[in-house]
């Protein structure tokens, strides 16, 4: 949900102004919960291979944007450059890991029936998930939480740390561009 009210944010370590991000109030949050609930069935019925491919596209996009994302981590979270590079790489690894693991774990399994019937075990998403991430790994942990929930068929309401929301917003933009529905 896009919120009109925006204020500049100060980085946790010093008075560096970082990009503005939308702020949400209780009504915005309630609206987002309702939208995530409505979107769940459609996303859950998206084949796991397609959801995994979406995460891989996001990983590729994140790799292409690595310098820009590192610069934002340096500015917003006061990471050193090498730590920022490591964090972006870890976020990329999370996207690829969960994509690969979901295809393996969520593949339908044929189970033998005691009387010869055909049984298939299918894992399904559970609904709308809330992911709350910390400020100290604002891209890697945020991305890992969101990726795991999305690839298993769940919709996500993500609440980044208030000290580092701009990098999380960039991750969300990359996920949407890769094919995760915005609504």
Enumerate the predicted regions with their spans.
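Hydrophobic alpha-helical scaffolding
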Residues: 1, 19-22, 26, 48, ...
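Short, structured beta/alpha segment
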Residues: 1-75
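Generic recognition of stable, solvent-exposed alpha-helical segments in well-folded globular domains
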Residues: 31, 49-57, 64, 68, ...
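Hydrophobic, well-ordered secondary-structure elements that form the walls
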Residues: 51, 95, 149
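Alpha-helical scaffold segments in carbohydrate-active enzymes
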Residues: 57, 61, 90-98, 174
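Glycine-rich, acidic and aromatic/proline-enriched surface loops and short helix-turn segments
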Residues: 64, 97-101, 135
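Rossmann-like NAD(P) dinucleotide-binding subdomain of oxidoreductase/dehydrogenase enzymes
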Residues: 74, 102-183
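Amphipathic alpha-helical
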Residues: 81-106
């Amino acid at each position: 949900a896009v919120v009109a009210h925006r204020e500049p944010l100060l980085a946790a370590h010093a008075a560096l102004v970082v990009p503005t991000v939308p702020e949400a109030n209780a009504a915005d949050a309630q609206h987002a919960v309702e939208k995530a609930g409505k979107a769940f069935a459609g996303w859950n019925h998206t084949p796991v291979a397609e959801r995994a491919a979406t995460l891989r596209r996001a990983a590729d996009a994140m790799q292409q944007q690595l310098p820009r994302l590192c610069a934002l981590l340096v500015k917003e979270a006061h990471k050193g450059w090498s730590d920022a590079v490591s964090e972006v790489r870890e976020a990329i690894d999370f996207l690829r890991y969960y994509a690969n693991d979901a295809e393996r774990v969520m593949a339908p399994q044929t189970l033998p029936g005691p009387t010869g019937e055909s049984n298939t075990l299918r894992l399904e998403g559970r609904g709308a998930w809330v992911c709350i991430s910390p400020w100290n790994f604002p891209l890697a942990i945020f991305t890992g939480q969101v990726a795991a929930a999305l690839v298993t068929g769940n919709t996500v309401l993500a609440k980044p740390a208030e000290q580092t929301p701009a990098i999380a917003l960039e991750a969300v933009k990359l996920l949407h561009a890769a094919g995760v529905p915005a609504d």
